[in-house]
Regions:
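Active-site-adjacent structural elements that line small-molecule/cofactor binding pockets in enzymes
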Residues: 1-269
Length: 269
């Protein structure tokens, strides 16, 4: 099934609150579907109050991009997610994964248990199960799962509404295409693409600017890059849906104004 395009924006708080709220209002006016925030303790405000404020400001869909399962008990993640679904009247989507590379050191620093990769994945399963129990029969909070390995992909096929791949900068188009086709062969889920680089710009909290080389990524034909030219971006996005199945594209807020013509052209199509 060909899904209509939608576009999300990762909008960390990097300025004073007035400027951040003004940016959110522009994002809404441009027609983006979803405001997203990262889960990075101390570097950013906590996701739940940030998203509640974003919803109150714009009325848009909001979501986490993405909860790191080891940072809190599964029931706590589920309770927070369910609460956001209730308070936004069903306009929240829970993005969740097992945590960014190097999260083990962060867990030790915070006195939290350091579980194995399999244990962290089980934490994702437990959080989704608890969320479904809290939602009950009358509410369904969409789950976006960030995956890479075969076990994570298998779990996503069981529990996720949307799948995004935790790709490396060196991953080629062909490598990601194979992962995507493997998932779609098993189940018709929505595919979301994390795009931290537009042109030569790197979005904060989507990739490390110090470790990201846009030119090298273009040379590798990475799907984590989009052209800065809106016309070229439209063509490339359409190609990625036709050839791979991507319909949900997530970019950084720094590029929201630049990519506004793309959203106007493709959103809902």
């Amino acid at each position: 099934m060909t899904r209509p395009f939608r576009f999300g924006v990762v909008a960390p708080v990097l300025s004073d609150m007035r400027s951040w709220r003004e940016r959110l209002r522009r994002v809404a006016a441009h027609g983006y579907s979803t405001v997203l925030v990262p889960d990075v303790p101390q570097w950013q405000p906590a996701p739940a109050p940030t998203l509640a404020l974003a919803f109150a400001e714009t009325g848009m869909r909001v979501g986490t991009w993405v909860y790191a399962s080891p940072l809190r008990p599964a029931w706590s993640t589920a309770w927070e997610a369910h609460s956001l679904s209730v308070l936004t009247e069903g306009r929240f989507e829970m993005g969740i994964g097992t945590g960014r590379p190097g999260i083990e050191d962060e867990l030790r620093d915070r006195g939290l248990p350091v579980r194995s990769p399999a244990g962290r994945l089980e934490g994702v399963r437990d959080a989704v199960a608890a969320l479904r129990e809290l939602d009950g029969p009358d509410l369904h909070t969409p789950v976006v799962m960030a995956v890479r390995g075969p076990r994570a992909r298998a779990l996503a096929l069981e529990v996720a509404d949307t799948v995004t791949f935790s790709t490396l900068a060196s991953d080629s188009r062909e490598e990601v295409t194979q992962m995507a086709r493997g998932v779609l062969a098993e189940r018709d889920v929505e595919l979301a693409l994390h795009v931290p680089v537009v042109g030569d710009g790197v979005a904060p909290f989507m990739a490390s600017a110090a470790d990201t080389d846009p030119a090298a990524m273009r040379e590798a034909d990475s799907l984590a890059v989009l052209p800065a030219d809106p016309l070229a971006a439209v063509e490339e996005i359409e190609r990625r849906r036709e050839e791979i199945g991507y319909s949900y594209f997530v970019i950084g807020a720094d590029f929201a104004d630049l990519m506004a013509p793309v959203v106007a052209e493709l959103s809902g199509r």
